[in-house]
Amino acid sequence: MANFGPKDIKKLREMTDAGMMDCKKALTEADGDMDKAVEWLRDQGMGAAAKKAGKVAAEGAIGIKVEGHKAVIVEINSQTDFVAQNDKFKALMDTVVNHAFENNLADAEAINNSTINGEPFADFLSQQIAIIGEKLVVRRAALIVGDETTAVNGYVHSNAQNGVIIEAKCDSAKTAEAMTPVLKEVAMHAAAMAPSTLSFKDFDPKFVEDETKGRIVAIETENEELRRLGKTEKNVPQYISMSQLTDEVMAAAEEALKAELAAEGKPEKIWDKILPGKLARFISDNTTLDQEQCLLDQKFVMDDSKTVFEYVQEKAKAAGGSAEIVHFVRLEVGEGIEVEEEDFAAEVAKQMA
């Protein structure tokens, strides 16, 4: 005689999301013991997870946790965006984010090689795959751990498709406290504007060189069409990043500007008043890459009269101190993952065969 009834089967199904017949078989194997039945389903789930291993997980969500001078960000991928929106997936995200935060796990490798609730993380994730029903991958993660003079904050977009954690070094604990809400604003900016790096100093020289050539070709091509239409052509920049504006380049630019002023008949005694503005314009015209991709050089989305760098400096000064953004991490779900396009009709035919 079975030591369980329909209510037990229903309860086990609600707990695990496993099929009705699988729950009945699990309870039979466990002689009605609910915990053992869950364990039996988990063991079977490992096999189910293995079947899903070949699937591409390119959807998912981003989760963060910020507390004090510490922050963590995690990307978990699933196969469909639908799954990433369900409560079980969200609960998994909370568990993994808290696990990474509490154990100072600095990246996805550290998480995947960790132990959670007394078992290998890989086993825990396999159980979640069985419960949720799709391949799941903890793909990326990052950790910030500061001290009392470090301001830390973060932001996740409402759809959980991108998120940011960020830190700034400050001159004092008082300034760090004042700058913490400011960093929340900057994190929101970074989530929206998607900077690829903190500063032009982080660019690879080869990338800047290739990007410069590409932009020149694109503008020259566009100018051909503008000429054909009799419209004003666009300026073709020599440079696109501050990393290219060496002392020699700036000295040459200054001499060229002086020659222009002389040609315009401007008195030499007023050049010192005119040159700073013209040099600033030269820098602005020749650092478009920085303005697009460097967080510190982007126009602040909440006040585009100043850059992010200028906004942070202004807020730090108002707090009676100084602060410098030293690091940020922005993750967007699925970036960099190649997904093969499937022939839906062929897939259906394959399953019907």
Curated annotation (Swiss-Prot):
Tell me the first and last residues of the signal peptide. none
Record keywords: Cytoplasm included? yes
* Matching Pfam families: EF_TS
Q: Which InterPro entries match?
A: EF-Ts_dimer_sf, Transl_elong_EFTs/EF1B, Transl_elong_EFTs/EF1B_dimer, Transl_elong_Ts_CS, UBA-like_sf
Cellular component (GO) terms are:
cytoplasm
Query: Could you tell me which Gene3D superfamilies the record lists for this protein?
Result: 1.10.286.20, DNA helicase RuvA subunit, C-terminal domain (1.10.8.10), Elongation factor Ts, dimerisation domain (3.30.479.20)
Q: Which CDD domains match?
A: UBA_EF-Ts (cd14275)
A molecular function annotated in GO for this UniProt entry is: translation elongation factor activity
Q: What is its main location?
A: cytoplasm
Q: Which PROSITE patterns match?
A: EF_TS_1, EF_TS_2
Q: Which UniProt keywords apply?
A: Cytoplasm, Elongation factor, Protein biosynthesis
Highest rank taxon of the organism: Bacteria
As for subcellular location, the record says: Cytoplasm
Q: Where is this region: Involved in Mg(2+) ion dislocation from EF-Tu?
A: 80-83
Similarity annotation: Belongs to the EF-Ts family.
What the protein does? Associates with the EF-Tu.GDP complex and induces the exchange of GDP to GTP. It remains bound to the aminoacyl-tRNA.EF-Tu.GTP complex up to the GTP hydrolysis stage on the ribosome.
Q: What name appears for this protein in its UniProt entry?
A: Elongation factor Ts
